């Protein structure tokens, strides 16, 4: 796992992950309760951009009262 953040707020959860793909590249996933958005990334610069965007999303959620879940 290259990047992972889990957040919760009032019974809702959000998880942001970036991991190595099974055969090639990387997979970025955004879990929002039961909805999942997935992107395949084939360029390391896009991975870096996805990490930065996920960090910003996580910070915005925390500003709105979401708490990071650490396991």
Give the ranges of each region predicted by the language model.
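Short, mixed-charge low-complexity intrinsically disordered segments
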Residues: 14, 48, 57-71
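A short, exposed loop/beta-hairpin motif centered on an aromatic-Gly-Thr core
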Residues: 32-49
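Intrinsically disordered, low-complexity regions enriched in Ser/Pro/Gly/Gln/His and often acidic
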Residues: 18-20, 37, 57-59
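Short N-terminal "domain-start" leader segments
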Residues: 1-25
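Surface loops and adjacent helix of pleckstrin homology
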Residues: 19, 31, 52
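A generic structural motif
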Residues: 8, 29-33
